[in-house]
């Protein structure tokens, strides 16, 4: 467009050359050329203004346009940055969700495995566990029965031994008492015979008899105590 305008201006200048025309006619032609040149200048100025506006206008306009474009560029850059950041955050969130889902899957699998072991495992495993528990229960029952039987036998034997020892102690005590009574009676008779053999006055014999009887009672009591202690020691 600018080349066309310049060619038109050049053609108008060449056409307005006064060398080939008379002087009066040249003046008139000069005015026409000036008018045409003024028109062309205005047209050129308008064209230049239009071109300047198309290219960015005046320096102030271009500066304002540059600032606006810079702001738009910043906005676009910020938008792309935000978009990239959101995209990265979406990727991170997706990875987090996947990781959390994997963790939940593993935890659920472990929980099911633990629950299966706690409940007894598979049907075959539960059947084997039931058989093993039944065998253990039988073993425990047999052990408790044996323990109770042995305990009962031991208690019965202990009570039998205690009763037998108690009966033996009673027999020994009766034997000791009988032997002490027999010795007391024999001693009393011997003392009486001896007193009669030795004679003495009746009062003396009576006093001697009383003393001997007291001594015999004391000896009898001593023998009884000795026999009882001996029986207790046995």
Curated annotation (Swiss-Prot):
Modified residues (Sulfotyrosine): 77, 141, 156, 220
Keywords, ordered alphabetically: Amidation, Amphibian defense peptide, Cleavage on pair of basic residues, Repeat, Secreted, Signal, Sulfation
GO CC annotation: axon; extracellular space
Main location, first listed in the record: secreted
Propeptide: 27-73, 87-137, 151-152, 166-216, 230-234
The UniProt record lists the keyword Repeat: yes
Keyword Membrane applies: no
Disulfide partners: none
GO molecular function, one term: neuropeptide hormone activity
Pfam families for the chain: Gastrin
BP terms from Gene Ontology: defense response; digestion
Region annotation Disordered: where it falls in the sequence: 198-234
Cellular compartments annotated: Secreted
Sequence positions bearing Phenylalanine amide: 83, 147, 162, 226
Signal peptide per UniProt: 1-26
Known tissue expression: Expressed by the skin glands.
UniProt cross-references to PANTHER family, sorted A to Z: CHOLECYSTOKININ (PTHR10786:SF0)
Described function: The pharmacological activities of caerulein are quite similar to the physiological activities of gastrin and related peptides.
Family: Belongs to the gastrin/cholecystokinin family.
Name the record gives this protein: Preprocaerulein type-4
